[in-house]
């Protein structure tokens, strides 16, 4: 990222203190794991607005309006959403749920890290809403690529999960020119003339491994299809999956902490299962309360990682639960140190 994209106030350091202890039963902890820079930025965006409202005495307003509205889950983790809601943020599915009085009062409306389509932005502008856009800069890059390629006359094949907030926003940039596919088998449904300018883009939370077969099928059917100069795959997606692969090799089972609607958390579980093979099973839990002690009977080592939207305290809770089950040893598997940071949205920086 450029120097302007760096903010020393945002850190991605994991907070769990790992001291390797050689014990019979142990936890194998993936590093990196948890919050990525885009998630950190999105959460801090809402927290900054809440703190400003608190400081100005506007957290509880006489008109009954909240200090901030957030369209959709700011990140795909229910604990993060519940925590921010407890501080006063109001989450809505659509802008129509926000009263006109809120727009007139200048109540901030935050767009989530996953991005939104031009239709949503146009509605917010029409209603005079004070928008703070917390779209992850890496997602924003894909939006800009769509617009550029459409201007240059391309048809765009976009690999993503149908219905995922990120995919909905990207496709919405130009629905008539962006063709969403999910799997290798979907390539058969595409039909382009040989003189069609084609380019391939993908959802940031997919991995290189996950898209490899689909990309190969696309290139086999449309040999002239182009790829952008740099990958759309998020660094955090690649890093977390690489760490989980190594953790799975050293574990009898793997627990991924993350919500069911988190694309990267679900994929981490799949990557872990692929790494385990027939030796063991991978599980996904929102928090320690969903652990089943029966999963760990007869095991010597349990691997742990978490999705990019997961606070480290939830991982700590899982570790504590496993320690109570006798997994008192601790080993960390580090594949890379992350130092990516994103500044707050421009709407908040202008206020400083």
From Swiss-Prot:
UniProt: [4Fe-4S] cluster binding residues: 36, 136, 234
EC number: 1.17.7.4
Entry's Gene Ontology molecular function annotations: 4 iron, 4 sulfur cluster binding; 4-hydroxy-3-methylbut-2-enyl diphosphate reductase activity; metal ion binding
Keyword Metal-binding attributed: yes
Catalytic residues identified in the record: 166 (proton donor)
Similarity remark: Belongs to the IspH family.
Name this polypeptide is given: 4-hydroxy-3-methylbut-2-enyl diphosphate reductase
Species, as recorded: Bifidobacterium longum (strain NCC 2705)
Lineage, top ranks: Bacteria, Bacillati, Actinomycetota, Actinomycetes, Bifidobacteriales
């Amino acid at each position: 990222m450029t120097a302007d994209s760096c903010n020393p106030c945002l850190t991605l350091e994991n907070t769990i203190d790992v001291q390797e202890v050689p014990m019979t039963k142990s936890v194998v902890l993936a590093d990196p794991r948890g919050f990525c820079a885009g998630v950190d930025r999105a959460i801090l965006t809402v927290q900054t607005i809440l703190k400003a409202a608190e400081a100005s005495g506007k957290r509880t307003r006489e008109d009954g309006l909240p200090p901030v509205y957030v369209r959709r889950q700011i990140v795909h983790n229910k604990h993060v959403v519940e925590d921010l809601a407890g501080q006063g943020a109001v989450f809505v599915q659509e802008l129509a749920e926000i009263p006109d009085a809120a727009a007139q009062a200048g109540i901030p409306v935050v767009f989530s890290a996953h991005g939104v389509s031009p239709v949503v932005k146009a509605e917010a502008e029409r209603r005079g809403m004070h928008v703070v856009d917390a779209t992850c800069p890496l997602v924003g890059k894909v939006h800009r690529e769509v617009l550029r390629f459409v201007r240059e006359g391309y048809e765009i094949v976009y690999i993503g999960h149908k219905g995922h907030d990120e995919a909905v926003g990207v496709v919405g940039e130009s629905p008539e020119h962006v063709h969403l596919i999910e799997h290798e088998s979907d390539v058969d449904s595409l039909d382009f003339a040989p003189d069609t300018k084609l380019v391939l883009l993908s959802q940031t939370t997919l991995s290189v491994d996950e898209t490899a077969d689909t990309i190969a099928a696309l290139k086999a059917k449309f040999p002239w299809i182009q790829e952008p100069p740099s990958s759309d795959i998020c660094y955090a997606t690649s890093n977390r999956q690489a760490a989980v692969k190594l953790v799975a090799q050293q574990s009898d089972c793997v627990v991924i902490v993350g919500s069911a609607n988190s694309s990267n958390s679900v994929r981490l579980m799949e990557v872990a299962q692929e790494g385990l093979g027939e030796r063991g099973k991978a599980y996904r839990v929102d928090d320690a309360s969903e652990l089943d002690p029966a999963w760990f009977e007869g095991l010597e080592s349990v691997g742990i990682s978490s999705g990019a939207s997961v606070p480290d305290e939830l991982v700590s809770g899982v570790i504590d639960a496993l320690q109570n089950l006798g997994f008192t040893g601790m080993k960390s598997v580090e594949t890379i140190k992350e130092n990516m940071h994103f500044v707050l949205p421009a709407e908040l920086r202008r206020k400083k």
